[in-house]
Amino acid sequence: IMDIVGRYKKVLTDIVGNRVFAYRAGGWCIQPFDKIEKALKKHAIYLDSTIFHGGLNKSKTHYYNFSKTPNSSQWRFNSDPLLDESSGFFHEIPISSIKLNPFFFWRLVFHKLFPSNTHKQFGDGVAAKASWLYFLRLVISRSWSVVSLDGFKASFLQRAYSEYKKKSFDDF
């Protein structure tokens, strides 16, 4: 992991010509953090934007549990990204999230089966495959989801902004 972080940071630095200091874990899989903590510290990567309040996935390939995040728009931490420590080395700026009704995911299935130009995704990336158990949980119970500019989730932006302001977070 140490070697991978170092090589990839160098490639990114060569491309952008500036200091690289931020990170987001693919698939939101930042836990257990001790697997990457030393590599990020060694390579001066201190800003993370992986966590989203309420996020939960316990599949064989993707694990994260963000059910107990600090009630803040940003925080510092050391070895646990869910523990607010004012003198922490790392700085977390969480992804905005909102709580969704299962009906949203049924509509998402409909839009996947019958695509339109209204909610197009950017780029050519492909989301990680979700387990059937994860999908089942989404369509039968309320769950948390990230807010995005991409695709159908862009419809959350106004609601997320309103909720953010209600919490008196003023660093939007």
Predicted regions span which residues?
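CE4/NodB-like, metal-dependent polysaccharide N-deacetylase domain
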Residues: 1-27, 83-85, 91-93
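Short coil/turn segments at beta-strand junctions that form active-site/ligand-binding loops
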Residues: 18-19, 169-171
